């Protein structure tokens, strides 16, 4: 006899590229950064250096627009061997500031899904990683905040983080559902805890969130092509 799946006591949504577009804004800014620094390398080289600086500094600055701004400045210093001027750095800073206040428009299906889950009385949470001020601002600008009973902004999404969240809210893994676009951050650590994970693919994907296919072998998670399909899965 199959044991029925318990009703979720907590349904968490990732924010960036799940509730609203985020990566396209960063990609657009990176294209402009490459153009500004074109005298110091080709596009592939500059993009690679920018990501390497970000990755190297993640333990110091974490994720988000401010970290990206610092990476732009450090990359410019490296590519110019320290010769970059304040006049040349200012456009980079201006680009970074745009990432802190771009308009937030919910992705297709988001309002429909949140409205229906709220009607059903489901307990909803935003669970996102990044800079506290930046992510709080995005939630506010999105107009979606009233759908969520809880907002959790964390510095990293791994098994330890999810376990802390479950413990804090008194929820067992089988009573928790995580919905997000990142296999690395939203799916793998949740599935490894024995909780339910729903993958909603989004493109483009930041290189840092890519997962080799072999890491997915044997991992139990559910994939939907559009967010509205989660309403059927969670019925």
Question: Which residues make up each language-model segment?
Answer:
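Asp-based, Mg2+/Mn2+-dependent phosphohydrolase catalytic module
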Residues: 1-8, 111, 115-119, 131-235
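An amphipathic alpha-helix signature
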Residues: 26-34, 69, 73, 132
């Amino acid at each position: 006899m199959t044991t029925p799946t318990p009703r979720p006591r907590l349904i968490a949504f990732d924010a960036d590229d799940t509730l609203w577009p985020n990566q396209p804004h960063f990609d657009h800014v990176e294209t402009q950064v490459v153009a500004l620094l074109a005298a110091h390398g080709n596009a592939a080289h500059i993009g690679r250096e920018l990501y390497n600086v970000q990755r190297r500094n993640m333990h110091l600055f974490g994720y988000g627009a401010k970290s990206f701004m610092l990476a732009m400045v450090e990359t410019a210093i490296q590519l110019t061997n320290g010769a970059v001027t304040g006049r040349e750095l200012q456009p980079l800073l201006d680009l970074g500031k745009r990432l802190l206040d771009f308009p937030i428009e919910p992705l297709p299906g988001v309002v429909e899904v949140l409205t229906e889950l709220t009607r059903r009385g489901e307990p909803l949470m935003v669970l996102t990683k990044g800079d506290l001020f930046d992510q709080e601002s995005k939630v506010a600008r999105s107009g979606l905040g009233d759908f969520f009973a809880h907002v959790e902004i964390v510095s990293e999404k791994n098994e330890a983080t999810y376990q802390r969240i479950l413990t804090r809210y008194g929820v067992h893994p089988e009573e928790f559902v995580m919905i997000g676009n990142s296999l690395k951050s939203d799916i793998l650590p949740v599935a490894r805890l024995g909780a339910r994970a729903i993958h909603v693919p989004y493109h483009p994907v930041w290189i840092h969130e890519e997962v080799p296919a072999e890491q997915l072998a044997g991992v139990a998670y559910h994939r939907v092509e559009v967010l509205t399909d989660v309403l059927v899965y969670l019925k």
